[in-house]
Amino acid sequence: MIDEAFAPAAAAVAEGRIPGAALGVVGADGRRSVRFAGMAALRPEPEALTEDHWFDLASLTKVIATTAMVLRLADEGRLDLDRPLTDAIPDLRQYDMAAAERRLTFRDCLGHRTFLPAVEPVYTYGNDPARLRAFVLQREWRHGPPVYSDINFILLGIAVERITGAPLSDWPLGAELGYGPPPGPAVATEACTWRGRILKGEVHDENAAALGGRAGHAGLFGTVAGVLGFAQGLLDGRGASPAALAAIRAPVHANRTCGWERRFAGWHGGEACSAATIGHTGFTGTGLWVDFDRGLAWTLLTNRVHPSRHRDTGIAELRRATGEAVIGAWDKAF
């Protein structure tokens, strides 16, 4: 089954569209299969990809870490999803008590239904993580229609740190998941013009790097096994409460739930998955999808930005083709 499911990714590696790829599939009963091919790095020294390599998970941080943290704190009664972020961050836009940012709720940010912009080059405003956090909190953000926004999750990350009194990196995320630098071999990402080097074991996202390497929107690293372990916890119910599972599956805005995307026409998970499927992707070439009806999850991890993001790797179509192949192979096998 796994060989059939991995065929699109194997072809992408063989054709030179991406340096390396790993596919992991897990069922609710814990059965797992993994395949990988290609290179963890092309530069500065060639390095073959192995099952033990840690990937920069990019925006999978939003669901594996930040969303899970927020929902756990809600379970514990330490925050209310429908209360404003100012419950945790009283100094958010503190010099304008009428500011719209002060009315944003945790659920608003989780579901990307705010007016905040998709992204802002926060890293260009300085190199002190504490001052950059203050900048994010005090900035009068330009308003626009709801979009998928890193700023939403930077704010959520700050809120989690305020509530717990500890950095995000202190949160126990599970085996083979954590903020960088990872403890094992790392997959290379981009030749970063800002930092003047090829990144390997340090976060690719510029804003996350400037915020100290750990932020609500990016910064998490993990192996295939680590991502599958998280996904299995969602499938078997051991990794999230019933309330948290309901929150990540129920629509909040358009095709979004608390943190995740729901299946919609043209999404990166493919068309074959059930309507009860949620997923998320990461800029570095990562992705995770969970089909609750089938009791199935799969993760496709690539280093498609290595050595540069400025090339057409066909990652969107590869993700869709992989989703179709995974579901097709699963349905034939079970």
Regions found by a protein language model. Name each.
Residues 2-57, 78, 309:
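Short, conserved catalytic-motif segment at the N-terminal edge
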Residues 85-93:
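Acidic helix-start/capping segments at beta-turn-to-alpha-helix junctions
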Residues 6-10, 23, 29-30, 56-82, ...:
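Active-site SXXK
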Residues 34, 84, 96-276:
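Short, surface-exposed loop or secondary-structure junction motifs
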Residues 236, 243-244, 249-254, 265-267, ...:
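Short, gly/Ser/Thr-rich active-site loops of penicillin-recognizing serine hydrolases
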Residues 19-21, 284-287:
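Short loop/turn microsegments at loop-to-beta-strand junctions
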Residues 33-35, 288, 295-304, 308:
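Short, well-ordered beta-strand elements
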Residues 55-58, 146-148:
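Catalytic tyrosine of NAD(P)H-dependent dehydrogenase/reductases that use a Tyr as the general acid/base
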